[in-house]
A protein has these predicted regions:
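Polybasic low-complexity intrinsically disordered regions
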Residues: 1-112, 163-164
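Short hydrophobic "helix-edge" motifs at membrane interfaces and signal-peptide entry regions
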Residues: 78-79, 122-124
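Basic, amphipathic alpha-helical segments enriched in Lys/Arg and hydrophobic/aromatic residues
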Residues: 98-104, 123-170
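Short, charged, surface-exposed secondary-structure boundary motifs
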Residues: 116-121
Length: 170
């Protein structure tokens, strides 16, 4: 018998870390969940990560970069590491930029008002982030994704993955 399976199974919310395990966070309107997406250059979804609503975006960055491979246009293995990544101001923090540079990924993230400006910010590359925003809009057309009906984060992530698959097929 395995030690982890010995004894009664936890009931209710026992054994789970609230807000992290089920990606439920508190906001003024009640519970909230953030959906972080990674898309390839054409705007197709590659990976998704869920976090609690009040969690900072930088905590999802590593998990998002570890997931998904982008198929190459020609022959060869899929790319696991993008050359650059564009994100909104929520991802703008020195630790997040440092972790992206350690992975040899150029961060194209505008700085927040309380941070010093970047002299080498690429506005043309940042405009490509529009594809991710449109991807989120297309995913939210599915009512089940726009409104989280599922109690469990794994079930909600399964619905998001199903929606991402539908977008790849259309």
């Amino acid at each position: 018998m395995l030690p982890a399976l010995a004894g009664p199974a936890p009931s209710g919310g026992e054994g789970t870390v609230e807000g992290i395990g089920e990606a439920l966070g508190r906001s003024q309107g009640g519970f909230s969940t953030k959906l972080h997406l990674r898309a390839e250059g054409g705007g197709k979804p590659v990976a998704a990560v869920l976090t609690a609503g009040e969690r900072h975006e930088q905590f999802a960055l590593d998990a998002l970069m570890d997931k998904g491979a982008v198929p190459r246009s020609g022959r060869g293995r899929p790319r696991l590491r993008p050359r650059r990544t564009a994100g909104d101001r929520g991802y703008s923090s020195p630790p997040a930029r440092r972790r992206l540079r350690q992975r040899r990924i150029e961060p194209v993230i505008p700085t927040r008002k309380d941070q010093p400006r970047q002299p080498d910010f690429d506005k043309a590359a940042y405009r490509q982030r529009n594809k991710v925003e449109r991807l989120i809009g297309r995913l939210k057309q599915y009512r089940r994704i726009a409104t989280r009906y599922e109690k469990r984060a794994t079930n909600y992530l399964a619905m998001v993955t199903l929606g991402m698959t539908m977008l790849w097929l259309t």
